[in-house]
Amino acid sequence: MAGTTAEYISHHLSFLASGDGFWAVHLDTLFFSLLAGVIFLFVFSRVAKNATSGVPGKLQCFVEIVIGWVDGLVKDNFHGPRNVIAPLALTIFCWVFIMNAIDLVPVDFLPQLANMFGIHYLRAVPTADISAPLGMSICVFFLILFYTVKSKGFGGLVKEYTLHPFNHWVFIPVNFILETVTLLAKPISLAFRLFGNMYAGELIFILIAVMYMADNFALQALGIPLHLVWAIFHILVITLQAFIFMMLTIVYLSIAYNKADH
């Protein structure tokens, strides 16, 4: 049983990869990330195309509520032009939420479906792969630099990382180290927070699924309510993690854009 369990868990934690080592490309992560993006674009474009000024349908009402909610958050936290930040925040929240929500699909369903087509390894949750959250966080990192330069200019960027917090040339090396660590900590923490929570959630689903393989009928039966309870709780987790990623992105960009005020 132990060996079977270990192999089962290892199989579910293996990627469909092209290449080896650092340069390996996780094809399953790419596919499901793109699929989540396509779902988001399809739903929102369909609502926009069929939008009516009369009595809206349920889907249009839901989309309008989400858009209004995100726009309100951006308005309250980003004190600058919202024409780019609001759509960016909306895209981040919806995209991350959809990628997270794939975790609610039974752990064996998609791998077994893929196995019918000769695909022996498949991990369906992109945000449980560090490469996806890290890729998004790197984009946020460059946006932070962009909005810092846009707000203060390139010279202001240099001053920010050499004359802050100690405004004296003697402390330039110290300031540079402190500010660089602070800057790099933002995308790293952003990525690992999302990855850690989603990886843990995926692993718990796998461990619950292992219970169905037990020889003890009582243990098998216990897996059903545990799976249901964890799935219900996980709905909160996937929503909260999407919100946190979006909210921290807004806050980081707001700080970068308004550094002249500090």
From Swiss-Prot:
The gene is atpB. The chain crosses the membrane at residues 24-44, 84-104, 129-149, 165-185, 194-214, 228-248. Belongs to the ATPase A chain family. Key component of the proton channel; it plays a direct role in the translocation of protons across the membrane. This is ATP synthase subunit a. The keyword Transmembrane applies. HAMAP family: ATP_synth_a_bact. The keyword Ion transport applies. It is a multi-pass membrane protein. It comes from Actinobacillus pleuropneumoniae serotype 5b (strain L20). CDD domains: ATP-synt_Fo_a_6 (cd00310). Gene3D superfamilies: ATP synthase, F0 complex, subunit A. The lineage of its organism: Bacteria, Pseudomonadati, Pseudomonadota, Gammaproteobacteria, Pasteurellales. One of its GO terms (biological process) is proton motive force-driven plasma membrane ATP synthesis.
